[in-house]
């Protein structure tokens, strides 16, 4: 997804019907705002995050150690229509403190949005991702994400909520609830500052105890201009189960 600053949906969620670890790492730290590449345009977004201070133990046997590990992925997107964007994440990669440089798999994405979301006071969408995972990246070979997008604009302030469900195909009750939230202030048409929160409450059948949940708060600066769009941030863990200090960088550019 380019970085810029209903009934069928419910049926799809039930059909896709799991928990993932609250300590699981991610290649993408981003709140979706329902913006997509224009019709006929290819976009490339580079996602990277580095855990400066985090867990020194793997989330499961054979997994990567989060601390001092770089995770990232190129995201290749194409605007199919004014309401649908297709995406491919390839390759997911890490340079880890315990396994060195590794490839983690790939993801396919289908993003459906309200057209021209950037010009509307209320906007919405939904994103579906399907992942093939290396054994060191996720305990499940196949997983997916269901990400609804809900947002409001109040002048120069945007409020966006992504109530994400992560799915490892182990039953509906084991879907993992991992929402993300963003509030930003648009200083100009090119610059914005934001606070983003990324949470993982655990499986919807029974949330994890508070001390085992992951909650991170990021301070973010966005630049939307030439030659590339940039989003950089620093994140702080709010619970003992969260990585304590994480840096993220997102670079995005239309290719045609």
Where in this protein do the model-derived segments appear?
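Bacterial N-terminal signal peptides that target proteins for export
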Residues: 1-10
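N-terminal signal peptide c-region/cleavage motif recognized by signal peptidases
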Residues: 19-21
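Transmembrane beta-barrel domains of Gram-negative outer membranes and organellar outer membranes
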Residues: 23-256
């Amino acid at each position: 997804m380019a970085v810029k600053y209903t009934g069928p949906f419910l049926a799809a969620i039930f059909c896709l019907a799991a928990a993932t670890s609250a300590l699981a790492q991610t290649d993408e730290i981003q709140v979706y705002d329902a913006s997509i590449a224009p019709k006929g345009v290819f976009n490339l977004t580079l996602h990277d995050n580095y855990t400066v201070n985090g867990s020194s133990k793997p989330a499961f046997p054979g997994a990567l150690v989060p601390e001092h590990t770089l995770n990232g992925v190129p995201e290749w997107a194409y605007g199919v229509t004014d309401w649908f964007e297709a995406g491919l994440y390839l390759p997911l990669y890490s340079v880890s403190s315990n396994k060195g440089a590794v490839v983690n798999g790939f993801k396919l994405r289908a993003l459906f949005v309200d057209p021209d979301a950037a010009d509307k006071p209320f906007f919405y969408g939904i994103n579906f991702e399907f992942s093939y995972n290396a054994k060191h990246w996720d305990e499940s070979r196949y997983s997916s994400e269901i990400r609804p997008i809900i947002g409001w604009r109040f002048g120069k302030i945007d409020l966006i909520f992504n109530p994400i469900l992560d799915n490892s195909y182990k039953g509906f009750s084991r879907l993992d609830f991992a929402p993300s939230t963003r509030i930003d202030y648009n200083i100009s048409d090119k610059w914005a500052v934001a606070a983003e929160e990324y949470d993982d409450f655990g499986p919807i059948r029974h949330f994890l105890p508070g001390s085992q949940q992951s909650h991170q708060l990021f301070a973010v600066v966005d630049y939307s201009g030439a030659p590339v769009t940039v989003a950089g941030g620093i994140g702080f863990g709010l619970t003992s189960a969260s990585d304590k200090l994480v840096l993220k960088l997102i670079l995005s550019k239309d290719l045609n």
